[in-house]
Amino acid sequence: MPNTKSAKKRVRVSEKRRLRNKAYKTFFKNRIKEVIKAIENGEPKEVVLELARKAQAAIDKAVSKGVIHKNQGARRKERLFKRVNEYLKSLEAAETTQE
């Protein structure tokens, strides 16, 4: 247990920040999962792109708040959009084979 007044405050502040960071992290992870689920369910192009934009915004917000490092944010966005682009290419390929 902390003894000094400042140490007690640090414990309180750290706990608040931990909970806030956890909330941001959970939020952007869920946004990413929504995109992946939409891709797996074969959702239309517009739906997937809209979800991807929301996920990108959530990741950017987590980076700006200092929850994750900017390089980690860039890596997560890159991996997400790589999956999105592969899905969009497969949709286009399916359309061209049907014609």
Curated annotation (Swiss-Prot):
Domain of life: Bacteria
Keyword rRNA-binding set for record: yes
UniProt entry keywords in alphabetical sequence: Ribonucleoprotein, Ribosomal protein, RNA-binding, rRNA-binding
GO molecular function, one term: small ribosomal subunit rRNA binding
One of the GO biological process terms: translation
InterPro entries, sorted: Ribosomal_bS20, Ribosomal_bS20_sf
A single Gene Ontology CC term: cytosol
SUPFAM superfamilies: Ribosomal protein S20
HAMAP family assigned to the protein according to its UniProt record, in alphabetical order: Ribosomal_bS20
Functional note: Binds directly to 16S ribosomal RNA.
Similarity field: Belongs to the bacterial ribosomal protein bS20 family.
Protein name, UniProt field: Small ribosomal subunit protein bS20
Taxonomic lineage of the native organism: Bacteria, Thermotogati, Thermotogota, Thermotogae, Thermotogales
Gene responsible for this protein: rpsT
